[in-house]
Amino acid sequence: MTEEDSSAKMSEDVEKYLNLNPPCSSSSSSSSAATFTNKSRNFKSSPPPCPDHVLENVLENVLQFLTSRCDRNAVSLVCRSWYRVEAQTRLEVFIGNCYSLSPARLIHRFKRVRSLVLKGKPRFADFNLMPPNWGAQFSPWVAATAKAYPWLEKVHLKRMFVTDDDLALLAESFPGFKELTLVCCEGFGTSGIAIVANKCRQLKVLDLMESEVTDDELDWISCFPEGETHLESLSFDCVESPINFKALEELVVRSPFLKKLRTNRFVSLEELHRLMVRAPQLTSLGTGSFSPDNVPQGEQQPDYAAAFRACKSIVCLSGFREFRPEYLLAISSVCANLTSLNFSYANISPHMLKPIISNCHNIRVFWALDSIRDEGLQAVAATCKELRELRIFPFDPREDSEGPVSGVGLQAISEGCRKLESILYFCQNMTNGAVTAMSENCPQLTVFRLCIMGRHRPDHVTGKPMDDGFGAIVKNCKKLTRLAVSGLLTDEAFSYIGEYGKLIRTLSVAFAGNSDKALRYVLEGCPKLQKLEIRDSPFGDVGLRSGMHRYSNMRFVWLSSCLISRGGCRGVSHALPNVVVEVFGADGDDDEDTVTGDYVETLYLYRSLDGPRKDAPKFVTIL
């Protein structure tokens, strides 16, 4: 899967540029200068008709070719007329925090939006660090856009609370709606999905990824309209309820443009075989369980390998949620074409992996559990010379579990996969030497996330802090934009980050640092920093105050289980009127003791053009 990291590349927030007051125009001063020049020459000149209108038409045509948000945001800051034209031509809007502005402000500025990407809760919500029912409601957004943008075609939501009523309103309000993607969302069920499937007759994309979908015991697959569909992508691997396979098979047959299909664990290997026979044009396949039903004795099983051979276009493979090892070799025939392979749900051993990975010479993206061990990573390093992204997740996430991957595997990857650009690596132990080798062998890294699961763990060999390893990463990887640090780290590691991490936009810290100096080094030294998330670290009010000059230009700051006082939080709130400061307990307890003692449990600080939100639950205090 590469979806989340497409999200990580969304580097510029539109809310930062959504102030309704456009930049001052220089047209009046230019006009005065022209008049003075003409008078000094003693002749009259008539200006061409509507010069501003002509220039705006030219600019409008040019901006159609400008797709980068960063570039468009820069254009909007040039002058008043450019600001106006850019707003008129903006078709796609990305909002990195749903509370950074109101729907009304969005609609006032942009009149022609066809695509909306909206994010809600911060990332630490994925680790149960945010209480349930905190917020991030989609309801006000869909209500506002339903009236303002009846031509809306695409909605991509991440960590939002979406109800079935929201989905019904969406389906009824946008007759030309084509794409719905819900990532890590909650609040809705199969009833809402059924309405979208039934009423959005031009639907091309319906992707449900890592979302909590309530089972309403409704056959939502059967709700797609009869006849040929426009579907190009259908993902429902996170739906934890059985589906009507006959209806799914018929839907696949009626979807000649279908390129991406990701099924859930209730689709057996035999059923997957039937789907592949029906849709040999697939390029991305999520296999579901990858385990066969009980085949009656004497009955011949389908030729799974032949089905994969027939799907010559497959380049992305995922799923394997309840796989049977003896069937894994069936995918061998497509391995040479694969650019993405996701085993992050499969407990695969090194000896299972090796016959597969040895044929994957073109892999760019590889995700797996740490069950592949260092031995499996060495096999990846020996074959996957084109690898750009690697993610290794823990099979057993407990801090005291045995770690099957280590610095040995990391160093092997760095030596064999020198084109690597992004890595997420969970392990129980690590060495400075392995991290330093990664920095030297893979200087093109833009994302380095090392999660040493045990708290305050030093170099596994020398017993020293991990300062030098992370220091080498920020020194040698000049393009680094995202960094996650862990293990035993002193303030010195953060001094390296502040000195060399000039392009870092996202920094995640867990159980690290000695004092407020560490936080000050980062806040004063990383000019591009947009997202700062810290947990269980000894940072207090002094460190918090060191970033006062930065917070108005950052998307958010998250501090949980640190040493921040309520008074320190209030001081930030009073000094920065465009910054919202929320404090709350980890479990959503209404008891004020969670925030009125010496330290607040959680601080969530973010910029907002429209002030504090109106839907904060009782356990959230907005200072």
UniProtKB/Swiss-Prot annotation:
Site (Interaction with auxin-responsive proteins): 210, 426, 535
GO annotation terms (biological process): auxin-activated signaling pathway; protein ubiquitination
Compartments, record wording: Nucleus
Positions of the UniProt region annotated as Interaction with auxin-responsive proteins: 126-127, 394-399, 451-455, 510-511
Sequence ranges assigned to domain F-box in this UniProt record: 54-97
Source species, domain of life: Eukaryota
Gene3D superfamilies, alphabetized: 1.20.1280.50, Ribonuclease Inhibitor
GO terms for MF: auxin binding; inositol hexakisphosphate binding
Pfam families per the UniProt record, alphabetical: F-box_5, Transp_inhibit
Annotated spans, Disordered: 18-48
Keyword Nucleus tagged: yes
Compositionally biased region (Polar residues): 33-45
GO CC, alphabetical: nucleus; SCF ubiquitin ligase complex
Pathway assigned in UniProt: Protein modification; protein ubiquitination
Residues that hold 1D-myo-inositol hexakisphosphate according to the record: 119, 158-159, 391, 447-449, 482, 530-531, 555
Quaternary context: Part of a SCF (SKP1-cullin-F-box) protein ligase complex. May interact with auxin and auxin-responsive proteins.
Further information: The myo-inositol hexakisphosphate acts as a structural cofactor.
Protein name: F-box protein FBX14
Organism: Arabidopsis thaliana (Mouse-ear cress)
